[in-house]
């Protein structure tokens, strides 16, 4: 006997919708709980089975917290700007807005079919002008506070496509789409000064409950380094250049220097005989993306400029090379190379026959770089010193000589904020003919994205908005002509603050009401994929800290607890993808097995953070368990089974209280697979009984409801209730019912186990000895033997020594 999910699930989804069951309560007498999902990009492909894993986890918490008497904010929305919709529009001539709306409608249908308890009144969409009005407002505040500025930045320019490409869209110097050549070209771009927040972004990681690996990824991305900036003179020239190093103590081992190919001094210092080679090399580098240039696995390339620098600590002449692995935007765009103690410098020195001088004892630098620590050698006044003392001594010397100073640098660069795209938030800026740049007045926001009948690249490197002359060209009241900014914001913009808008999504006067922000922030739990570990989470923290500084939000950090669910892989353990043809569509699973089965299966697959392969058998197993519950509690006629009675049943008492305690604990700690195991254990116990107390059945159904809400609502109704289960007080347990009053005692003869008995915990030594000697198996083993000694350990064992 089985239940009909095709009738049951739509029935309860309709009930929740008509009764607005999951509308966020804002009762001042209750505690608040904010459970947030990383909102999806509504792609044309729709949901895949990976999406519901994180969504089910937050839904379980949300449903449990409502039953525990909390106000719960559990919202959903759409991160709907972005490249795929624009590409689709360029390829098909369709409107990206219409395409996005269709995709959102499909995602909404799919999400509702899975029974998630979202408050749909709070739905947001980053492409809605009433939403992006506030994205633009935040940009204006950043600009007013000196944190948004324009700069000439080298971008990936593809003449054939007439557009600028992101690093990810360039493969081996060619466009991912079409395989056209891509060049590095300087263009004016908007930048956000995230570096101003580097220290706070680093230090405040200590305030949040996040996975340590994610914190480490952010720390590495920010990359705070303490060291020294050292000035090198160029031989036979008045020019100097600076390098930053974390190891100024190894200066005696610096045997050459390397410039980024874009370094401004190259032009001036290259000798006539090296000019041709240097120019050819620079052209070659133009075709490479940053990722390719810094790939550790690739062969080192470079070229000698013909010029020499003077090592400031020992006066030696050292050659100046250029190489692609040095990037102009990191540090000073020049490095001092210590090949004896740095793997990359060692490989480069070997490739080009450059001098390798060890300055730390240990290792064999004829074979490989020694990157460990040891006392200093070949280092004059630093000889014999350990690392920390030597660094201090070297910096003191540099500062005394006036050729260096202590310095802190960051790997973090300012955020390149403009995109040469149509489908994004317009940047609310006007460039006037007299050179002034102004913001669109705040009372004129939102600056609407204009409709375009045809979206095509401008051909100049500007966005397709540059083609819309009526929109771009403006005149002020004094007849001064200007042009609107044609770049749009990156997709990261709308997702950097969306969690604030959910708190007060209809507010037309502010991002959200201050009191409401104070009540709901920070987000209690944020669940999503680890692929957003750095960029999204770092950008959102940056914007949040800025909004904190200008008094908009009341907390320093946006997300108190972060959890990354694992990836659901294809049956063959490969990542699910269209090209592999192994994507599982949740629609098909819901049709065949039901949404509750899908939810149960995804939570039972393994630990939430693990990446696990999809398995159809596991899905069938999940459905069988739900059918087993149904058969235990419901008759063929759909009424409550006769074995469910109001009578007590001492045999189930301990199992019930143990289940309530452990399931609650496991849900709280996101250990859903072990929580489900406890539900299964209880059902196994219940099957062995002639009667099951109705109170225990009700408690069980409540514990099941966050995982399988449709089935739980149906069972709740069969149990005689007329209201939804969603707000019924969460079951409680009695600790005294869990105390063990019996223990298992091992009975041994000469140290070998012969029998086991269960006795009252309170029995003393004499009683245990007596029971042991009367045990039938012990009698058999003692026959014909003389008892020499009896060892009794109460609560554990009785060992009889006999011969």
Curated annotation (Swiss-Prot):
Its main location: cytoplasm. Transmembrane segments: none annotated. It holds the Pfam family tRNA-synt_1. One of its GO terms (biological process) is leucyl-tRNA aminoacylation. The keyword Ligase applies. The keyword Aminoacyl-tRNA synthetase applies. GO terms for cellular component: cytosol. It is found in: Cytoplasm. Keywords: Aminoacyl-tRNA synthetase, ATP-binding, Cytoplasm, Ligase, Nucleotide-binding, Protein biosynthesis. GO terms for molecular function: aminoacyl-tRNA deacylase activity; ATP binding; leucine-tRNA ligase activity. It catalyses: tRNA(Leu) + L-leucine + ATP = L-leucyl-tRNA(Leu) + AMP + diphosphate. InterPro entries: aa-tRNA-synth_I_CS, aa-tRNA-synth_Ia, Leu-tRNA-ligase, Leu_tRNA-synth_edit, M/V/L/I-tRNA-synth_anticd-bd, Methionyl/Leucyl_tRNA_Synth, Rossmann-like_a/b/a_fold, tRNAsynth_Ia_anticodon-bd. A motif ('KMSKS' region) lies at residues 575-579. A motif ('HIGH' region) lies at residues 40-51. Its EC number is 6.1.1.4. ATP binds at residue 578. HAMAP family: Leu_tRNA_synth_B (MF_00049_B). Belongs to the class-I aminoacyl-tRNA synthetase family. This is Leucine--tRNA ligase. It comes from Listeria monocytogenes serotype 4a (strain HCC23). The lineage of its organism: Bacteria, Bacillati, Bacillota, Bacilli, Bacillales.
